[in-house]
From Swiss-Prot:
Listed name of the protein: Phosphoglucosamine mutase
Source organism of the structure: Bifidobacterium animalis subsp. lactis (strain AD011)
Gene expressing this chain: glmM
Keywords: Isomerase, Magnesium, Metal-binding, Phosphoprotein
Root EC class: isomerase
Family to which this protein belongs: Belongs to the phosphohexose mutase family.
Keyword Isomerase in annotation: yes
Length: 454
């Protein structure tokens, strides 16, 4: 039986896969697993809930809070707030757990629930397995004064988070480091529709806001980091210095330069890593990336005296490696960037602020900064209906990969990744030219299809 928890919590079609009953049961199970006595100033257990702008978030947040409060937790409902805002508040308010109701960049009908432990860190697999193990089980729940209360305080929670974000680039509290910078902010009609524009304005930027009118149904719809075209067009039309685009729960950010050219997560990480090294804040002069990061980033950073450490795909694995090796910066090509100086998870709004700050500090345009991190030409082919697990053991496939890697040398690479949810293998190649990347990928994809066919 597959795990209920995926790589980023529990997700599914709201009211079909993810029902009110399941949300209640998850809240009930989570209090049993995550409740502790450490760090509490009173004898009450506390949890915090936040959500994105999906209409289904209403009933799911009520159900989740019901499960938690029935289990004896006082619940603070922070309302609509970015996922990293919940992580921050879980830490700063010293509550025992935080929970986010969001399906991130997925379409509106989907939703999800994920948890943060005390301190604002995502749960390890072992804790998720414990929650799943007790899900729906009966237990001796509290009665009388032992049951929890639910309070609603969106304004205080949001302002605490915005203050924290701005302080990352304006530590004195009254500076306006982004004064004179014109920025387009595409909020994906999602959780940062209030937070990102306000944080950028407080930092002094001239902000043009688009896709920040959530109605419960338009989250991620032709907007945000998965559909940045409207942001790119607005940058060109308005003469802005740059644009930033977030996803539905604002844990990721992509950017565009003044000409509307996209700047991806790899380039953003490169820019921020170099800035941190200059300031003496890049621990061990190392950036943590995933296997999907472009080889061009690694080669450019090497020239700058910056090493890279590679993990599997997923910001949770990036964070695990950052904690293990005491690294200060890491992330993914998709725009998840974790800046451990200020956050315990990927934070799109923080990424936007620090990127804008580096544009101002450097005196260079975003186009100039991004040009220092050229991306090698890349090709990706999904090969369906194959035995995906055999991709790592099949002799013919492994020999073919070795041949291609030898041909590419130091200016290219090959990656075979089994899908986590489908019977397919992703075949990716990077090379000095697009033609070479296309040819390598085509040859390998054919061998994978022939050798691993179901």
């Amino acid at each position: 039986m597959p795990r209920m928890f995926g790589t980023d919590g529990v997700r599914g079609l709201a009211n079909r896969d993810l029902t009110a009953q399941l949300a209640l049961d998850l809240g009930d199970a989570a209090v049993r697993v995550l409740g502790d006595d450490g760090g509490r100033e009173t004898n009450r257990h506390r949890a915090l809930i936040g959500r994105d702008t999906r209409v289904s978030g209403d009933f799911l947040s009520h159900a989740l809070a019901a499960g938690m409060s029935a289990g004896g937790f006082d619940v603070i409902d922070a309302g609509i707030i970015p996922t990293p805002g919940v992580a921050f508040l879980t830490s700063v308010l010293n509550v025992e757990m935080g929970a986010v109701i969001s399906a991130s960049h997925n379409p509106m009908p989907d939703n999800g629930i994920k948890f943060f432990a005390r301190g604002g860190f995502k749960l390890p697999d072992t804790k998720e397995d414990e929650i799943e193990a007790v899900l729906g089980q009966d237990w001796e729940r509290p009665t009388g004064a032992g049951v929890g209360r639910v309070s609603h305080d969106t304004t205080t929670a949001t302002n605490l988070y915005i203050d924290h974000l701005v302080s990352a680039i304006a530590p004195e509290g009254n500076e306006q480091p982004l004064k004179g910078l014109k920025v387009v902010a595409d909020c994906a009609n999602g959780a940062t529709s209030v937070v990102a524009p306000e944080a950028l304005r407080r930092a002094g930027a001239d902000v043009i806001v688009i896709n920040a009118s959530p109605d419960g149904y338009n989250i991620n719809k032709n907007a945000g980091s998965t559909h940045p075209e409207s942001m790119q067009a607005m940058v060109r039309a308005s003469g802005a210095d740059l644009g930033v685009a977030f996803d539905g729960d604002a844990d990721r950010c992509l950017a565009a330069d003044a000409e509307g050219n996209m700047v991806n997560g790899d380039q953003i990480m490169g820019i921020l890593a170099r800035a941190k090294k200059r300031e003496g804040k890049l621990n061990h002069d190392t950036l943590v990336v995933t296997v999907m990061s472009n080889l061009g980033l690694k080669l450019a950073l090497k020239e700058m005296g910056i090493d890279t450490v590679q993990t599997n795909v997923g910001d949770r694995y990036v964070l695990e490696e950052m904690l293990r090796g005491d690294y200060s910066l890491g992330g993914e090509q998709s725009g998840h960037v974790i800046n451990r100086e200020f956050a315990t998870t990927g934070d799109g709004t923080l990424t936007a602020l620090t990127l804008c700050n580096e544009v101002v500090k450097s005196g260079k345009s975003l186009k100039e900064l991004a040009a220092d991190f050229p991306q090698l030409p890349q090709q990706l082919i999904n090969v369906p209906n194959v035995d995906k697990m055999a991709a790592k053991t099949n002799k013919a496939v492994l020999e073919a990969v070795a041949r291609e890697e030898e041909l590419l040398g130091d200016t290219g690479r090959v990656l075979l990744r089994p899908s986590g949810t489908e019977p397919l293998v992703r075949v990716m190649a990077e090379a000095a030219t697009q033609e070479q990347a296309d040819e390598v990928t085509a040859r390998l994809a054919q061998i994978v299809a022939d050798e691993l066919a179901l």
